[in-house]
From Swiss-Prot:
<keyword id="KW-0285">Flavoprotein</keyword>
<dbReference type="InterPro" id="IPR041364">
    <property type="entry name" value="Rbx-bd"/>
</dbReference>
<dbReference type="InterPro" id="IPR023753">
    <property type="entry name" value="FAD/NAD-binding_dom"/>
</dbReference>
<dbReference type="GO" id="GO:0016731">
    <property type="term" value="F:oxidoreductase activity, acting on iron-sulfur proteins as donors, NAD or NADP as acceptor"/>
</dbReference>
<dbReference type="InterPro" id="IPR036188">
    <property type="entry name" value="FAD/NAD-bd_sf"/>
</dbReference>
<keyword id="KW-0963">Cytoplasm</keyword>
<comment type="function">
    <text>One of at least two accessory proteins for anaerobic nitric oxide (NO) reductase. Reduces the rubredoxin moiety of NO reductase.</text>
</comment>
<dbReference type="InterPro" id="IPR023961">
    <property type="entry name" value="NO_rdtase_NorW"/>
</dbReference>
<dbReference type="Pfam" id="PF18113">
    <property type="entry name" value="Rbx_binding"/>
</dbReference>
<comment type="similarity">
    <text>Belongs to the FAD-dependent oxidoreductase family.</text>
</comment>
<dbReference type="GO" id="GO:0005737">
    <property type="term" value="C:cytoplasm"/>
</dbReference>
<comment type="pathway">
    <text>Nitrogen metabolism; nitric oxide reduction.</text>
</comment>
<keyword id="KW-0274">FAD</keyword>
<keyword id="KW-0560">Oxidoreductase</keyword>
<dbReference type="InterPro" id="IPR050260">
    <property type="entry name" value="FAD-bd_OxRdtase"/>
</dbReference>
<protein>
    <recommendedName>
        <fullName>Nitric oxide reductase FlRd-NAD(+) reductase</fullName>
        <ecNumber>1.18.1.-</ecNumber>
    </recommendedName>
</protein>
<dbReference type="Pfam" id="PF07992">
    <property type="entry name" value="Pyr_redox_2"/>
</dbReference>
Length: 377
């Protein structure tokens, strides 16, 4: 008798995998176990909740029970998995255990919080649950410090500014989106945020946070300090690998998987923000959607290696939206930038004259798909 497939996690990756499995097999036993409520919400919406005056509960799209009924699943919400016995094919919580034929880790990633004095005063916005815990102080805060000038930090800075709050955006780097693109490309967004009223503290490092009568005092390594009402950590994500380690599978930055999404144990797989696919962590929606399609086939007896095409990453900054693709972080590319009032096209060219990366903004985003076709991957 088939013991079926167990998926640990309930986020976008887990749900996409369930849908793809059920397209091919309506009856294989499917069990989902997760520490949260398992209600569905759209995680990218977290970048816009403040300007749109949304409460955490407004983000819910489908209740867990409806999802279970629609896709013929067993769900175990609010359940912490304590251990995995890979040899016995058993998943254990404090008071239950489940046997499986195939196990999928879809445990996601946790928000990184800088290890500074007063770090407990920092808020994170990496899940509906985290937003629910801090929505009142964030709604009431007038002065907000966002630590981290990457994708999420830039999106949140624009959103909080659009909501009428006084926003300071801090980063160690000399420019925004520094891990994604060179400053000559990100400068358009940087200037726009400044024009909106966002105060940028670049080449700056936070030293400590202290509670005061007036709110929170943030002190920089330079000893400069600012008073704010709320501090948000947007310094990146750390793949959740603790369960994989307990199961004895190989872990690096994320849970190491091959092109079949298979870990070092033949019956354990990983997908989504927790997975490191052939050395790459890809915490974006499109790679997860494609991973779910291929993994569903492989869990049901197929042997299909994941093939990822050139893909767009969208920066959700509505007043100056950006699309990027390719190896935008490469430092050896020569950038050809055309900037006009209706938008920007920046092309990253290799020494051989090949298009290796591009960034487009505003009305020039309509040219992204044509550029994708000419991108060398």
């Amino acid at each position: 008798m088939s013991r079926g497939i167990i998926i640990i996690g309930s986020g976008f990756a887990a749900r996409q995998l369930v849908k793809n499995i059920r397209k091919q097999d309506a009856h294989v036993p499917l069990t989902l176990i997760a520490a949260d409520s398992m209600d569905e919400y759209n995680k990218p919406d977290l970048s816009h909740v403040i300007s749109q005056s949304q409460r955490a509960d407004d983000l819910t799209r489908q209740l867990a029970g409806e999802f279970a009924e629609q896709f013929n699943l067993r769900l175990f919400p609010h359940t912490w998995v304590a251990d995995i016995d890979a040899d016995a094919h058993v998943v254990k919580s404090q008071d239950k255990q489940w046997q499986y034929d195939k196990l999928v880790l879809a445990t996601g990633a946790a928000a990184l919080v800088p290890p500074i004095a007063g770090r407990e005063l920092m808020l994170t916005l990496n899940s509906q649950q985290e937003y629910r815990a801090c929505e009142i102080p964030l709604r009431d805060a007038q002065r907000v410090l966002i630590v981290g000038g990457g994708l999420i930090g830039s999106e949140l800075a624009m959103d909080f500014c659009r909501a009428g709050k006084t926003v300071t955006l801090m980063d160690n780097a000399a420019s925004l989106l520094a891990s994604l693109m060179p400053p000559e490309v990100s400068s358009r967004l940087q200037h726009h945020l400044t024009d909106m009223g966002v105060h940028l503290l670049l080449k700056s490092q936070l030293q400590k946070l202290e509670k005061t009568e007036a709110g929170i005092r943030a002190t920089l390594v330079s000893q400069h300090s600012i008073e704010v009402d709320a501090v948000i950590a947007a310094t990146g994500l750390r793949p959740e690998t603790a369960l994989a380690r307990r199961a004895g599978v190989v872990v690096n930055r994320g849970v190491c998987v091959d092109s079949y999404l298979q870990t070092s144990h033949p019956d354990i797989y990983a997908i989504g923000d927790c997975a490191e696919i052939n050395g790459q962590v890809l915490p974006f929606l499109q790679p997860i959607q494609l991973s779910a399609m291929y993994l569903a086939k492989n869990l049901l007896g197929g042997n299909a290696p994941l093939k990822l095409p050139a893909m767009l990453v969208k920066v959700k900054t509505p007043e100056l939206p950006l699309h990027l693709a390719g190896e935008t972080q490469r430092r050896d590319l020569s950038w050809q930038i055309t900037a006009e009032s209706d938008g920007m096209i920046a092309k990253g060219m290799s020494g051989e004259g090949q298009l290796r990366a591009f960034v487009v903004s505003e009305d020039r985003m309509k040219e992204a798909f044509a550029l994708l076709k000419t991108l060398s991957v």
